[in-house]
Design a protein with these regions (language model features):
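Acidic, proline/glycine-rich low-complexity IDRs
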Residues: 3-18, 33, 46-51, 59, ...
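Intrinsically disordered, low-complexity regulatory segments enriched in Ser/Thr/Pro
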Residues: 36-72, 117
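Short, surface-exposed tryptophan/glycine-enriched loops
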Residues: 71-80
């Protein structure tokens, strides 16, 4: 699954790097019938104390989402998603460029985000 995620993210970043803004966030969505998706956004603002920092979108992949089906609960999906993103931030094509942003995070759009790195 990581390979497909990395291909999706590489394609997005090939077309859009450098992303505008100061921080990045991976929005995770629960779709229907155990389908899940991830959207990349960049934000004009970052403050770890402000839980809405990722609402200040400067860039978004919009409907171009990474999607998959998996029969597990949302907690496991959050773990799996963060693990894929951390792996990309370690070995992905744009890992070093993404880590130049103030922070990178991931989380469900209706919940808290997990800070994956800070600069």
């Amino acid at each position: 699954m990581y390979d497909e995620f990395a291909k999706w993210l590489d394609r997005i970043l090939d077309e859009n790097m450098p992303l505008p803004g100061v921080a990045i966030n991976f929005n995770i969505y629960e779709e229907v019938d155990l389908h899940w998706s991830i959207q990349l956004i960049s934000s004009t603002y970052f403050d770890e104390e402000d839980e809405d920092w990722n609402c200040y979108e400067e860039f978004t992949t919009g409907e171009d989402l990474y999607e998959w089906q998996q029969g597990v609960g949302w907690e496991k999906i959050l773990d799996i998603s963060c693990e894929m993103i951390r792996k990309y931030l370690t070995e992905g094509k744009y890992a070093e460029k993404l880590k130049k942003y103030e922070a990178g995070a991931a989380g469900f759009v209706d919940g808290d985000v997990e800070i994956l790195y800070r600069r």
